[in-house]
Amino acid sequence: MPCRFRAVWLLSLACLVAPAIWADDDDTRFLQDQTRRSIEQKAQAEEALAAPPGTLMYEGRRYQVPSTLEALTPAIYVAINTNQWRQLPDFVARYRELPGHRPALANMAESLLARFEGNYPLALQRMELASEQEPTDARVLLELARLWFEDHQEKRAEQGFARALDAGLPLEVQMLIQQYHQAMDIRAGWHGSAALGVGYNDNINQANGYYSCLNYFAGICFFERQMPDPIESELVSYELSLQRRYNLSGNHNLQLRPMSYGTYYAETNPSRTATMQDYSTNLAILQVGYQYLDARNSISLMPYAEHYYRNRASDYLAHGLQLEWRRTLSRKWQIGTSLDTKRYEYTSKGQRTGADYEMHQWGLTASFMPQPNTSLYTGLTLSRRKYEIEQASSKDWAARVGLYHAFPGRAGLFVNGMGIYRDSRNDAHDFFLGDRRRDRQQVYILSAGANGWKVAGLTPELRVRHSINHSNLDWAFGFEQTEVSLMLRRQF
């Protein structure tokens, strides 16, 4: 949003206000993280399709396995079926030395051991070799289809499960395959949420009401500086964040990420001569691009377009390109990094309060899930905004940390909080403002809801956002803002 510097010795000055741009970036990231978390929570249900680790026992007794085909063949199957992974390497090594052994069984065993250890490339290589050696073995076909499923190769998995069924499987295994098909249907659908809410904002124009007299004479102020007063307003807001993946072949996918959110404020600017009359906003983003996805990695290249509406007019149209890589280190740890470049082009009306510029951004993220209902996440972002005017160009870095926790119980209570600290410095001294601008901003976002209190499938959610911006030019850019909203959200 714009700020206006007013003084009798200066007719007008249009200021490019970075905090409003930062606010949109923060809201976009918060919604994207929320959508990603929803997908990860659904993926946790898929883990129930795999048996947990066990111990090396059979019917309560421990057996010594001699080096014979008659003993090692069933021992390998028992070790696999009961997750006796510590003993499996010894069994397979001795089994391979025996004449007349089945190479496919040894490769299947080594594949499942590699899967247990998290080495999916080796697991797939060994299982595909086993399938080539015994193309009609139902167990090999089933395990290969499961590996393809876990590696996000849905088309291959679907074909693999069909071949396994044709090879003949017990009824309980057929029911398990049906569960895999249901899981693939869920994967192929839309994920995300839509929300509608009402609330209150105590400073929609990010103002501070600063006043000072620059020159007195004989008790009369001849030169004064007066900034706008904060405008309070009730509001209506909405959010829509969706994601869908189309498996093309193997690990290659087409990914869609549409997103839109906005706020309507009941109050407008009381000054009819002000450049900014209506602070209501709407942001829409569409990302369409390529994604490589396997059991451990997600690599995406996403061109996108962004449209911003405010002051009752189209404000700007931006287009950009995002490259993102995320790596799952273990069941608990995930890291990621991203590069983003974007070009903002303002409309004729938008140029009253802004100017065209380029933004380049690098980000680093990490998340830790100590338990299935708790997630800690953090990130660091470096940004560069380049205008034609050096005084308006800036560099900034931002650090954020967040916590999500779902409480046990019928109410389904959950809380999601994020804190952001941002430090921004402009490139050059501005003689109109009298200094080289530097801002330090804090943003706190807290949302809490109850999945057990749904009304017509809608979850009630309370959200509070508080922003504090300190500047060496505090009279122009310093402000505090608090927004509270009650939303009803539908998860997809």
Task: Pin down the residues of each PLM region.
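Gram-negative and organellar
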Residues: D24-G60, T68, I76-T82, R86-A93, ...
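N-terminal signal peptide c-region/cleavage motif recognized by signal peptidases
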Residues: V17-P19
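Flexible helix-coil transition and linker loops at the boundaries of alpha-helical arrays
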Residues: G60-Y63, Y95-P99
